[in-house]
Amino acid sequence: ISACLEIRRKVFIDEQNVPKELEIDDYDRSNSECEHFLITDNGTNVGTFRLIYDKPKIAHMQRLCVLPEMRGKGFGYAAMSFLKEECKTRGNSKITLGAQCHAIPFYESCGFVCVSDVFLDAGIEHRTMEYVL
């Protein structure tokens, strides 16, 4: 998990100015309902995301990020493809996520749809999105 947290620090805390106390939460301190995934490229850590299983048959994806210098190379799309297959294998019927508004076109291109109005999370505009498996 330390490699995942280091990437999140670089992206969310350093780049996006999210306060550390909001970025690091109870899901990072306990693994009971949360699983962290590291995105790598030939042994180099390039991104991360986590899945939370706190509702039956629904996986909630959070904290997808790719290091700035590695963006635009398909790692986000690869992660979303893996995410869908992993959740399907686990018997989930739906994936939800809170997307930063600037990232909505990316998630829409992966088949997600917006299901909420805009809300603020850590001072950043988000919308809830879903993908039905």
Please tell me what each predicted stretch does.
Residues 38, 44-52, 60-65:
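Conserved beta-strand in the GNAT
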Residues 96-98, 108, 113-128:
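Conserved catalytic-core motifs of GNAT/GCN5-like acyltransferases
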Residues 53-61, 71, 91, 121-126:
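A conserved beta-turn-beta hairpin within the catalytic core of GNAT-like acetyltransferases
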Residues 80, 86-100:
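Conserved GNAT acetyl-CoA-binding A-motif
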Residues 1-26, 30-31, 36, 40-42:
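Short amphipathic alpha-helix that is part of the acyltransferase structural core
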Residues 62, 69-71, 102-109:
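Acidic/histidine-enriched, beta-strand-rich ligand/metal-binding domains
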Residues 66, 72-85:
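Conserved acetyl-CoA-binding loop-helix of GNAT-fold acetyltransferases
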